[in-house]
Amino acid sequence: MGYFYLTAETWTLLVAFVTLLLVYAYWPYGTFKRLGISGPKPVPFFGTMLHYRRGFFTFDEECKKKYGKVWGIYDGRQPVLCVTDPEIIKAVLVKECLSFFTNRRNFRLNGPLYDAVSIAEDDQWKRIRSVLSPSFTSGRLKEMFEIMKNHSANLIRSMKKKADKDEPLDLKEFFGSYSMDVVTSTAFSVDIDSLNNPSDPFVTNIKKMLKFDFLNPLFLAVAFFPFLGPILEKFELSFFPKSVTDFFYASLEKIKSNREASQQKSRVDFLQLMIDSQKNSGAQQDKSLTDHEILSQSMIFIFAGYETSSSSLTFLAYNLATNPEVMKKLQEEIDATFPNKAPVHYQPLMEMEYLDCVINESLRLFPIAARLERVAKAAVEINGVVIPKDMVVMIPTWPLHRDPEIWPEPEAFKPERFSKKNKDNIDPYIYMPFGSGPRNCIGMRFALVLIKLAVVEILQQYSFSVCKETEVPFEMDIQGLLAPKRPIQLKLVPRS
């Protein structure tokens, strides 16, 4: 009769392996206990990531209620310090932003986006940001406004076809195409007209790019075994689909080459400012971007511009449809600012007070950046909290924006919270839909102009209305970016 037999040496090796595996599995999970910081109990390898199955925003909200203003979680083996204390937030995002903290954590598997402004660190980040910033001044935005209006007019025409048939609209489809068209035309002087060409490869590829899952095997592998990051990077593995990044880099390379070869003077857009930086000489030469950096910034601008603007417009339309009294008041301001459906102009649009209140309140409920991250470059103590070197500091804006102690009836849509009378009472380190400090969202003002123009021109002619296809309240998706689980659908009702 056969039996299972192991030599003493084999048993010794097996016990040693299991011991080392257990040490590896449990080693990082004493970090917050040593720092005197409470938090949910981690499990080996996963840390506290299994809680994300119900949505990271739900998890953040529950932790804030249970543990207060500071707590610790573990993304796999990575300790993450979560803070909602305004004093600590101010220090991390502003006061000590450049001296003690760098950008969000880098999982390394960024593919060709390794030098995008959202991933670059320290001096490289400063150089890239300084080149990009002039693209978003008031003067530049005013120049872009007429281009945006061409696409907002196209948006209205496309929506009208649905309204005329009394059919519901999938908001993300329309606002996504509008955002894509505005971004590509203002940034690269290229008109793809994705509103009339929904199968355009720019749109289909960006949708593939946005399908990110926290339980992606590649993401989990790096979370469980961080040392695998550099190894997998050598094999050119990436969180982003290679076919998608290849498409965008090839398209942008072609646009850039055509621009450089053309003798015609192009308007000064996002791409041109980056190309011009390469023509600097002397001391200014150090501020120029490489060819690859130009392509990476272009790619991230498409990615961020599409998602943030289209999602914000979708949530805003839903909030207006489910709060018709707010929509009516906003339409009254629109009619007073642009009587008899007059053409929308930049300056009056920027001065609309109630419109600002409505957008700010929608961004409170559904912030573009539901989590902000920084990484400590050196050990530092802030407001009595010790932050070790390499610690990830995470600021969860979702629970900050819905804290009942700060916002009475936090789930209610009340734009008056941001009125002239009340807005001075709002702590800028509590309300941060675009982040805060030197590393805030560089395209914030661009996104706001795009959003304001679309909503005003739509509400000049129509009202948003819930219909039998509208899910009220809608269920949030638990994976990846802040988004509804199912598409939000509304109807447009013509105004009398």
Swiss-Prot record:
<keyword id="KW-0560">Oxidoreductase</keyword>
<keyword id="KW-0472">Membrane</keyword>
<dbReference type="InterPro" id="IPR002402">
    <property type="entry name" value="Cyt_P450_E_grp-II"/>
</dbReference>
<comment type="similarity">
    <text>Belongs to the cytochrome P450 family.</text>
</comment>
<keyword id="KW-0479">Metal-binding</keyword>
<dbReference type="InterPro" id="IPR001128">
    <property type="entry name" value="Cyt_P450"/>
</dbReference>
<dbReference type="InterPro" id="IPR050705">
    <property type="entry name" value="Cytochrome_P450_3A"/>
</dbReference>
<dbReference type="InterPro" id="IPR017972">
    <property type="entry name" value="Cyt_P450_CS"/>
</dbReference>
<dbReference type="GO" id="GO:0020037">
    <property type="term" value="F:heme binding"/>
</dbReference>
<keyword id="KW-0349">Heme</keyword>
<dbReference type="GO" id="GO:0008395">
    <property type="term" value="F:steroid hydroxylase activity"/>
</dbReference>
<keyword id="KW-0408">Iron</keyword>
<comment type="function">
    <text>Putative steroid 6-beta-hydroxylase.</text>
</comment>
<dbReference type="GO" id="GO:0005789">
    <property type="term" value="C:endoplasmic reticulum membrane"/>
</dbReference>
<dbReference type="GO" id="GO:0016712">
    <property type="term" value="F:oxidoreductase activity, acting on paired donors, with incorporation or reduction of molecular oxygen, reduced flavin or flavoprotein as one donor, and incorporation of one atom of oxygen"/>
</dbReference>
<protein>
    <recommendedName>
        <fullName>Cytochrome P450 3A30</fullName>
        <ecNumber>1.14.14.1</ecNumber>
    </recommendedName>
</protein>
<feature type="binding site" description="axial binding residue">
    <location>
        <position position="441"/>
    </location>
    <ligand>
        <name>heme</name>
    </ligand>
</feature>
<dbReference type="InterPro" id="IPR008072">
    <property type="entry name" value="Cyt_P450_E_CYP3A"/>
</dbReference>
<keyword id="KW-0256">Endoplasmic reticulum</keyword>
<dbReference type="InterPro" id="IPR036396">
    <property type="entry name" value="Cyt_P450_sf"/>
</dbReference>
<keyword id="KW-0503">Monooxygenase</keyword>
<dbReference type="GO" id="GO:0005506">
    <property type="term" value="F:iron ion binding"/>
</dbReference>
<keyword id="KW-0492">Microsome</keyword>
<dbReference type="Pfam" id="PF00067">
    <property type="entry name" value="p450"/>
</dbReference>
